[in-house]
Amino acid sequence: MPQAVAGPEIERLIQLLGRMPGLGPRSARRAALQLIKKRETLLAPLADAMRIAADRIVVCHACGNVDTSDPCTICRDETRDPTTLVVVEDVSDLWALERSGAVKARYHVLGGVLSALDGVRPEHLTIALLVERASAPGVKEIILALNATVDGQTTAHYVTESLKPLGLTITRLAHGVPVGGELDYLDEGTLTAAIRSRTAF
């Protein structure tokens, strides 16, 4: 076990930062040092923001987004298209779509994907709530914005079957060549998906 190089408070900060996705021990140490160096301009404001977030953040009972109000800002936004529900795996996917500005609809966060390997079954996700929301008067289209993984595809098929009796239009995001992508660098699966979902130019 490596020897501690600082007091227990700093070691705890490094440990906690190291639990963040994408931050290993070395990156956590660097981040902790940056926070310590910029104590007044970064560490103190960050600590305040985290304290406030811990006290006020809630999960929206309607869509599953995280916000400081329930229903969330998106669900309360009356300018959004009430006829369309965009289904995503996680809040991070919802935020990515919002950053793109490509859709001005309402969302539904499943809370994950079906996975036999990880033991995630339909009752572990918010699929029943999705069916209930999709049954509401005025809903016409469900956009499946799920990741193009095996578990994502399995979940998309299950959700489609669950919603089929409602007679709604069910669409999914196109798969294929990313903007700025070069064909030579793409895998065969991506190229196949791009060919199959080609559109008129």
Swiss-Prot record:
Which PROSITE patterns does its entry note?
RECR, TOPRIM
* Pfam families assigned to the protein according to its UniProt record, in alphabetical order: RecR_C, RecR_HhH, Toprim_4
Gene3D superfamilies (UniProt xref) = 3.40.1360.10, 6.10.250.240, RecR Domain 1
**Zn fingers (C4-type): where?**
60-75
Q: Name one GO biological process term.
A: DNA repair
> What CDD domains does the record point to?
TOPRIM_recR
Toprim domain: residues covered: 83-178
The record's listing under InterPro entries reads: DNA_Rcmb_RecR, Rcmb_RecR, Rcmb_RecR_Znf, TOPRIM_dom, TOPRIM_RecR
Q: Which UniProt keywords apply?
A: DNA damage, DNA recombination, DNA repair, Metal-binding, Zinc, Zinc-finger
Output the superkingdom of the source species: Bacteria
What Gene Ontology molecular-function terms does this entry list?
Answer: DNA binding; zinc ion binding
Role according to the record: May play a role in DNA repair. It seems to be involved in an RecBC-independent recombinational process of DNA repair. It may act with RecF and RecO.
Tell me the protein family, please: Belongs to the RecR family.
Protein name per the record: Recombination protein RecR
